Amino acid sequence: AGQTCDGLGTHQFFNEGKLITNEDSSLAEGAIRGWDRGSVYYFSMLSSVAKHYGFKLETPWKDLPKEHQDKVLYGSGKTKLEFIYINDRGDKVTRNHPFEGVIPNMERRYRDTESQMVREELSKYLSVQPCPSCHGTRLREEARHVLLAEKNLPDITCMPIGEAFDYYTNLQLEGRKGEIAAKIL
């Protein structure tokens, strides 16, 4: 089985194309649903990011430099930013820490939640692609390099059924190769 995909051959990821609701909208107007002015907590985080990197939340998403878009989507790395929070008593509290990023935030919330409703809401932003480790073959690298009469397992499994049947029917392996292959054929 592929190591990254647990043998499924596919990989789910949060697709930034699905996250950006309208490239003409600004972050303040809701370019990223749930991170606009209506969500005080997330919007205050974006305000801190914008202040630190020197851009305006009212700028349309498409007009933000890619560097700023990447900081919003993927975070500040190890760079600490100043965040101001309101605690339970209504006091302002200042904290310095890296910004997680919208996509890592969603990945964490999707992975850690026990709420089916939260998982369903976040799954709207997921896309599926072939696993980057096994390239969709569902096999570890070592298994992908095993040859059977000059064809590897992914090549054989991609054949139409009739062609694969003919391939196996006409397959002749002699000696030691035949002994080894007999166990799996």
Which residues fall in each region the model found?
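Conserved phosphate-binding elements of NTP-dependent enzyme cores
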Residues: 1-185
